[in-house]
Amino acid sequence: MANNNNIPHDSISDPSPTDDFFEQILGLSNFSGSSGSGLSGIGGVGPPPMMLQLGSGNEGNHNHMGAIGGGGPVGFHNQMFPLGLSLDQGKGHGFLKPDETGKRFQDDVLDNRCSSMKPIFHGQPMSQPAPPMPHQQSTIRPRVRARRGQATDPHSIAERLRRERIAERIRSLQELVPTVNKTDRAAMIDEIVDYVKFLRLQVKVLSMSRLGGAGAVAPLVTEMPLSSSVEDETQAVWEKWSNDGTERQVAKLMEENVGAAMQLLQSKALCIMPISLAMAIYHSQPPDTSSSIVKPEMNPPP
């Protein structure tokens, strides 16, 4: 080792990575050829000790090899066991060059290992990706809305009972007023209200006529003209209605359908009352002079 330090640095030529690569391949082939003969003559002997190549940067210094871990068999004494790692002592006074050492390690070791591992990976079939798992149904079930009539909430039960009571009352009103509109609930209620008002008026008129208060009944009767002029003649209104068949129509409807008769009278602003009461109301009213016909004066001839 001391002699190597005295050698000038200019005289040492660094071997190229290609030369080291071929030297390691040749050393590996020599070792494999001689290891069979060495191991065949020795029985029960353990594996040979690993050798470490200490190169000084000169080809003549590769023969200086030392055994690591003590002496070994004779067959392995002069053989070189390449590790793929060489310690160059040629330059730097016994220290390694980081750039050259790393380059040699990458070229020798990594390339050899990668080339040896390629057939293994290329020989095996590629693993197929696992098929996607079907979408698992969530354990939480969506909230199902209760059907009508099966609610358990107290507020919902009370609301359902209220709707049932309203429907029963409307059916009862439909029975009282047969001719009412049953398709539209709002229109049906309006017709029922008008019908009730008409009945209240009839009750007042009939009750007061029995008590003899004809004068008090008159303001309750719907205002209507008591006379009209037809061809220069004064005629009572009820006489006209009697002549045009209104009375007979109302009498017929009273026998068949009372509700229809009430609606007909209401449309004509009439109400039912005894004849005696009607005559009393008529005689109690003063004669209407405003309805008399005033004939225009005739211009005298010139």
Curated annotation (Swiss-Prot):
Describe the location of the bHLH domain by residue ranges: 150-199
Q: Name one Pfam family in it.
A: HLH
Q: Name one GO cellular component term.
A: nucleus
Q: Tell me where it mainly resides.
A: nucleus
Give the top-rank taxon of the lineage listed in the UniProt record for this protein: Eukaryota
PROSITE patterns reported in the protein's UniProt record = BHLH (PS50888)
MF terms (GO), sorted A to Z: DNA binding; DNA-binding transcription factor activity; protein dimerization activity
Could you tell me which residues belong to the region Disordered? Answer: 124-154
Provide the free-text tissue specificity comment from this protein's UniProt record: Expressed constitutively in roots, leaves, stems and flowers.
Q: Where in the cell is it found?
A: Nucleus
The record's section on PANTHER family has: TRANSCRIPTION FACTOR BHLH83-RELATED, TRANSCRIPTION FACTOR UNE12-RELATED
Kindly provide the name given to this protein in its UniProt entry.
Transcription factor bHLH7
